[in-house]
Amino acid sequence: KLKNGITAYLVADATAQPLVSLQVAIRGGAYLDPKGKEGLTSAWGAQLRQGGTRSLPAEKLDARLDFLAAQLNTYGGNEEAGLFLNLMEKDVKEGLALALEVLTQPAFAQDRLDLWKRNRLRALEQLNDDPAGIERYQVGLLTYGADHYAARWPTAAALQGLTREDLLAHHARMI
């Protein structure tokens, strides 16, 4: 257990490849999304990585990770959020520094948030064209009831209403 309360595990790679994989799981998730702000955790999780950091705009972060041949992804789920990092062992120091910066100093760039919202709105419009999507929604409603977070899907109004300030406030709760 680290000083800040985070539980960390180190597992050796049996393949002996010169690769390092890191996974960070964060307690919290969509169950924290206020009514009317459904999709907040999902937006926050995506924008941690996609929105750059205070010292590295998104394009520079992308370029640096590309140069290192590293994969760094973040997500926000129903009950947890997290980060995945995969890179060469020789680059682990810089990769960990970038991962820490992404987690602790996100910029949540407005242009990247706007793009994410447009993409999510398009996906929402297509939801009724996908039987599997309808099924996931209905199973959540039938299993948990309409007021349970796992059954609450983002509406167009909720997605359009998400702001950079919402992401910053959510970040303060999550990290």
Kindly give the residue locations of the regions a language model identified:
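Short, intrinsically disordered, charge-balanced linker/junction segments flanking boundaries
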Residues: 1, 171-175
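Active-site beta-strand termini and strand-to-loop segments that position acidic
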Residues: 2-3, 13
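M16 family metallopeptidases and their MPP-like homologs
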Residues: 9-11, 15-49, 53-104, 117-125, ...
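Peptidyl-prolyl cis-trans isomerase
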Residues: 107-108, 113, 162-164, 170
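A generic local secondary-structure boundary/capping motif
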Residues: 128, 169-172
